Amino acid sequence: WGFARGGMGSITKALTASLQAAGGTVRTGSGIEKVLVRNGRAYGVVLDNGDEVQGRRVISNMDVKRTFLKHVDEAELPGEFVRRVKAFKIRGSSGKLNIALDCAPKFTALPEGSPHMKGDMHFTDSIEKMERAYDDWKAGHYSVDPFQDMMIPTMIDPTMTPPGKHFMSCFVQYAPPKIEGRDWTDADRDGFARTCLDQIEKYAPGFKSSVLHVEVRTPRELENEVGLTEGNIFQGELTFDQLLFNRPVPGCAQYRSPIKDLWICGSSTHPGGGVMGAPGRNAASEILRDMKTPSKDMSDAYAVL
């Protein structure tokens, strides 16, 4: 993996600086209430504080369900398109732990100073164990013996924490969007966190005594705090029927929507999720082509998977 110096927030700061350098404006804490549409064309948005922002185009990087089912009047959309968007699969399957540590963990399987501490570590013993963890998700539970993908980025970038302290990031599978069909509770969240911490303790005795703080994000937090429907970090399941020309839905796979000048550029579009920026970059290429002002610094969207 590549590491951003200063943490993943540095990526956001760099993108913000680039936009501002080009004359753009960033407004944080400004949720959108609805997309304004007149005569089949998008011409702006209404923010949740009532402000209107108008423009020649509206470009949404929200997931396809949130964009069209929550913020666009259904009457403005073709019925078949609405049906396909409603059928788009977007079940979340993962959770996240961000852990502040008083000191680096000591894994019994790794010698002191092992270079593997600087890499990506997986907590799993076999394919069968991963399958059992997935079975829990299918039954509507978080995994009792999860598959954890763990990194300690401060091993590479110590500027992220005070001297001697560390930060651990745990990507955890599996966690369903609902627990046996009901919403997550705080007790569920805390139980999920304990399960993850207990598992790490088995591989690194004494680990839990070094924990200073834990931020837990189940699919509930990912939806409520980050805006990811059902907590799906890829804005839609990456199944064969939802890839390539079928992403997000057949007939609208080139970042355009049925509403003129309403574009989609998030991970619900091709090629899907991950920290790569390809959906946004491809959407930008298509928008420039639509404007008949292609950038000499950007190849056609189809050239980028």
What are these regions (language model features)?
Residues 14, 18-22, 31, 61, ...:
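Generic, well-ordered alpha-helical scaffold segments in large soluble proteins
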Residues 33-161:
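Mid-domain catalytic core of redox enzymes
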Residues 59, 99, 170, 196, ...:
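Hydrophobic, well-ordered secondary-structure elements that form the walls
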Residues 65-70, 100-102, 122-123, 162-199:
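Conserved FAD/dinucleotide-binding core of flavoprotein oxidoreductases
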Residues 142-153, 206-270:
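A glycine-rich dinucleotide-binding beta-alpha-beta segment and adjacent secondary-structure elements
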